[in-house]
Amino acid sequence: GPESGTRPIGHEYNKGVRALCDKYGALMIFDEVVTGFRVALSGAQGYFDVVPDLTIFGKIVGGGYPAAGGVGGKKEYAQLMAAGLATGKHRAYVGGTLAANPLSCLAGYTAIKEIERTNACEIAGRMGDRLCDGLKSLLKTYGLPFVAYNQGSIVHLECTGAMSFDFSSMAFLKSAAGLLKHKDMMYVRKDSMERMGAAYMANGLVTLAGSRLY
């Protein structure tokens, strides 16, 4: 989703979530706004080998062309989506000012076919591996207390752990006071991220929130 792997998980995690959704009758919805057609042509669901019930996509379905996004899923759920009202039928209203815009649809179709033709996901993934390995080497060489990791072409360079807290304490879990207690620490970490982002930019390295590189 929008955090694009900020909290890294193993392949078995999503399979466990899938099993829980099946057990309790809940829909499994994947936010693939960032990961769709990026970590793999089949997105994060292909990368993790898990089939969600519904999937949300962002601008990629329009090849970066404006006014594009998408929702896909299993037929049994997608057939409940409707752009209008149908008497006597259960429907979930889905619509938008530019929904089903033909130019955006064509742009997306063409872009995805080109991604497939050029094997772009795999090539970008190898570049992500190379960049991450280089960052790890630099961190080790200079003894920096940072962490670098990646999922394909999505690379993370974490210098503050902005949202990393110890949730092992039951007292912390039972009350929102835990987060309030640590709010000053959160602000300090956020400020550090912003400063790192500015330093990266000054040296020609564009990041998102001072930690992510696509």
What are these regions (language model features)?
Residues 1-214:
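Conserved N-terminal phosphate-binding loop of PLP-dependent enzymes in the Aspartate aminotransferase
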